[in-house]
């Protein structure tokens, strides 16, 4: 248990940040799932539009520190390749 006032404050702050970060990661996952759903349906135009919406969310996660830069780049690259393969 936290003994000092500062430690108690850090616990409160960490709980708030965890909630915000969790929501941010969930939002990123939702955008990526929309791209994957469009890919599964075979709709290249919808997939391209969904990827254009997902890209800023992915890289916003990088700038906010909830997703590693390489992870975001890898996800974006793989989705782009899958869209290109639809031809």
Curated annotation (Swiss-Prot):
Q: Which UniProt key words apply to this protein?
A: Ribonucleoprotein, Ribosomal protein, RNA-binding, rRNA-binding
Q: Which domain of life is it from?
A: Bacteria
Kindly indicate whether the keyword Cytoplasm belongs to this entry. no
Q: Which InterPro entries match?
A: Ribosomal_bS20, Ribosomal_bS20_sf
List GO terms (cellular component aspect).
Answer: small ribosomal subunit
Question: Would you identify the family this protein belongs to, as annotated?
Answer: Belongs to the bacterial ribosomal protein bS20 family.
Name used for this protein in its record: Small ribosomal subunit protein bS20
Q: Which organism is it from?
A: Rhizorhabdus wittichii (strain DSM 6014 / CCUG 31198 / JCM 15750 / NBRC 105917 / EY 4224 / RW1) (Sphingomonas wittichii)
Instruction: Identify the coding gene.
Output: rpsT
């Amino acid at each position: 248990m936290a003994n000092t006032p500062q430690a108690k404050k850090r616990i409160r702050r960490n709980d708030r940040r965890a909630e915000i970060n969790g929501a941010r990661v969930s939002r990123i996952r939702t955008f990526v799932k929309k791209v994957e759903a469009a890919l599964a349906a075979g709709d290249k135009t919808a997939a391209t539009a969904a990827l254009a919406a997902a890209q800023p969310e992915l890289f916003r996660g990088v700038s906010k520190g909830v997703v590693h830069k390489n992870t975001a780049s890898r996800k974006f690259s793989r989705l782009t390749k899958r869209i290109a393969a639809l031809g």
